[in-house]
């Protein structure tokens, strides 16, 4: 990992910055509303190290250089609390970062497109209300890059 950080330092940050972020049911915070399993996998033996946790807690790093954000989540996600998305939206708003957020009333985590093609275990994961997020994202991208 130290080699990767050195390579990044030699890059032009503006050249490697994404033009936009599109996130679905994202893990944002390492705080009390965190999805602990994500941080255990990400940080391994350092998953209890507060400095490391703060370094990967996204809401702490949103600033004016953050690219525009499109995000969606379901209110009933029982894996990653919807508050993660709300924290992201709040941080973007405070930093003046354009953000479009869609909260759908039902659906669990891992819905993908919410269609029969992406459903898992039979009908689990078919959520008609969620099926509109790709259309919304496409419209957002068209506005953003028009």
Describe each PLM feature range.
Residues 1-8:
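Short, small-residue-biased leader/transition segments that mark boundaries at the very start
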């Amino acid at each position: 990992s130290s080699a990767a950080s050195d390579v990044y330092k030699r890059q032009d940050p503006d050249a490697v910055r994404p033009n936009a972020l599109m996130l679905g049911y994202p893990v944002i915070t390492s705080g009390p509303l965190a999805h602990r399993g994500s941080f255990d996998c990400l940080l391994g033996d350092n998953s209890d190290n507060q400095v490391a946790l703060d370094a990967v807690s996204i809401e702490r790093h949103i600033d004016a250089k953050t690219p525009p954000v499109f995000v969606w989540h379901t209110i009933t996600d029982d894996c990653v609390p919807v508050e993660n998305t709300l924290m992201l939206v709040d941080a973007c708003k405070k930093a003046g970062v354009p953000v479009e957020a869609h909260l759908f009333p039902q659906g669990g985590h891992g819905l993908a497109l919410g269609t029969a093609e992406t459903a898992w275990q039979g009908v689990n994961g078919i959520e008609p209300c969620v099926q509109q997020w790709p259309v919304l994202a496409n419209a957002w991208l068209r506005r953003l890059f028009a």
